[in-house]
Amino acid sequence: MMAAMAVLAAPVVRAQQQAQQPKPEETEVWQPVPAVVTPGETPGAPPSDAIVLFDGKNEDEWISAQDHTPAKWIVADGLLTVAKSTGNIETRRHFHNYQLHVEWRIPADITGTGQGRGNSGVFLASTGPGDAGYELQVLDGYNNPTYVNGMVGSIYKQSIPLVNAARKPGEWQSYDVVWTAPVFNADGSLKTPAYVTAFYNGVLVQNHFELKGQTLYVGKPFYKAFDGAAIKLQAHGDKSEPMSFRNIWVRELP
């Protein structure tokens, strides 16, 4: 009798087990559909949703970081070359989170040593005139010793790069950066810190690094509230030959 009941119950048990088995459709997500972005035709070329900050033609997207007058660096032969006497320049637009691509070249005949050799910087958020903000260091890193938290690829005086991927002076180099801006409470206190991931010549040098605040030449970093900021390029005061930039674009992120 018991055996017969077991035989009769078996199909019911199997049916229940099959009903309880997860289905692949239960974990499929169909909405929202990501926007279509057309990649650039070549590596480093701006995708279809990029804001081109320098295309080799003019400085329309840039202003003086000191007084917000039109930028006065040198545009020639498709390049944007630092005019050191005119100071730093920054974007007219302000950004929060973004993906940035920038290419730069230190002259082949560069002179100087250490911090005085091909020095510049990409400030991922400019918080005032001069060097106020959050700097990703630009410097000749090819056989040019300096303090390692100020070498090329560093978050200046906060984070040593994972590796030195520098090319020789005279060769074009690139940064690809993902910037997550800090968020502040209504009273100006920090809610969430800034983070940066950076690739230097295609090599990871900063991996989701949490910044301690603004980058400073002297003193300890600190946060000062802001809501959106320009991207700034540095005209460093060293005496070495000026460097050039090209192909600068940004993609705003959520």
Regions found by a protein language model. Give the residues of each.
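Bacterial N-terminal signal peptides
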Residues: M2-A9
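Carbohydrate-interacting regions of secretory-pathway proteins
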Residues: V12-P254
